[in-house]
Amino acid sequence: MENIRTLAEVDPEIARVLREETQRQEEGLELIASENFVSPAVMEAVGSVLTNKYAEGYPGKRYYGGCEVVDVAENLAIARAKDLFGADAVNVQAHSGSQANMGAFMALMKPGDTMLSLDLNSGGHLTHGATFNFSGKLYKVVHYGLTRDTETIDFAQVESLAKEHKPKVIVVGASAYPRTLDFAKFREIADAVGAAMLVDMAHIAGLVAAGVHPSPVPVADIVTSTTHKTLRGPRGGLVLSREPYAKAINSQIFPGIQGGPLMHVIAGKAVAFKEALSPEFKAYQRQIVANAKALAEALQRAGLRLTSGGTDNHLMLVDLRPKKLTGKVAEEVLDKAGITVNKNMIPFDPEKPMTTSGVRVGTPAITTRGMREAEMAVVGRLIGEALDAAQDDAALARIKGQVKELSQGFPLYASRLK
């Protein structure tokens, strides 16, 4: 039969892409804070026959027949997410974090309503009201930022703007903020002005699940997340809420902004949630934070400045201005050395978003490989050496060899290269 031929037989070009990407992940150091390595079990679920099944609607209330089996998968995902985060209601159908946010916003606001959120240049996310994003086009957006001296959230500004603009929703969450988020303080401000509180915990969901970071679930009205990043599941979205918001959220996700859910991805989410309920996952999350602190110290020893002076979570922002480098150049230099990071705006950055003055560095992926504090000292040193050798391709090639040697001691998907 045609459909039982292997990928290499059907499409050798894509088979080569898979092999080369596996090799890149295997031999390099993945330090992009939003990336992680899923388990073979998650990959098995996502690459399964569930990709064949349409299932518009929700368990027990589908618009298609033959959904009795996939209903089991979705109900498992919902139950496990409730258990993991202590949420009243859960929607696991959002295809991405952006769609989770869109559904949540539409459940809370009408077009033209006001939201108060962290500015993108201060570490926020584009779905939190960036002018070029749907959120900035549909809603009136007021942004809060950071203090110049501490480079942490300026709560005096948050409170002042909330009182002035009376937002319908206060959005809490970030894509590049290395410090603990004070959810209780945001709740206090939201209550004072009659605003709903939405937390986007996409970056810290794994830390929250393990109790390593305070949970927003008891204090927020709605919590959104991705299911990858620190949660280490497949790429997708998740919405947690108090029960009164559940019906509105569900109707906005489907049929509001999506059609059929991705049942193979929902099954992968269920697997990831089960993994996240284990004691091993909690230990893993603790190690992510320990590794981040160790890596931050190593980078500082290498002469690099970190915004806010360090990190409380899984990521850090490196200010490259003292090195006379841009984030764009640093990303390219480190890539030559087999170290993957992403250029990132830093607080009060004078550069443009495609240039930036910094890079974002995170530890979830290398912690999944089994690396610990001792390896973080090595990684920090190698980053420093690579940036100091920005114009020396021979030196960068030597560092890449050291990176490969280090990585080979912590195999990931090596069996897939055989």
From Swiss-Prot:
Its cofactor is pyridoxal 5'-phosphate. One of its GO terms (biological process) is tetrahydrofolate interconversion. Pathway: One-carbon metabolism; tetrahydrofolate interconversion; Amino-acid biosynthesis; glycine biosynthesis; glycine from L-serine: step 1/1. It catalyses: (6R)-5,10-methylene-5,6,7,8-tetrahydrofolate + glycine + H2O = (6S)-5,6,7,8-tetrahydrofolate + L-serine. Keywords: Amino-acid biosynthesis, Cytoplasm, One-carbon metabolism, Pyridoxal phosphate, Transferase. One of its GO terms (cellular component) is cytosol. SUPFAM superfamilies: PLP-dependent transferases. It is found in: Cytoplasm. Belongs to the SHMT family. Homodimer. This is Serine hydroxymethyltransferase. It comes from Myxococcus xanthus (strain DK1622).
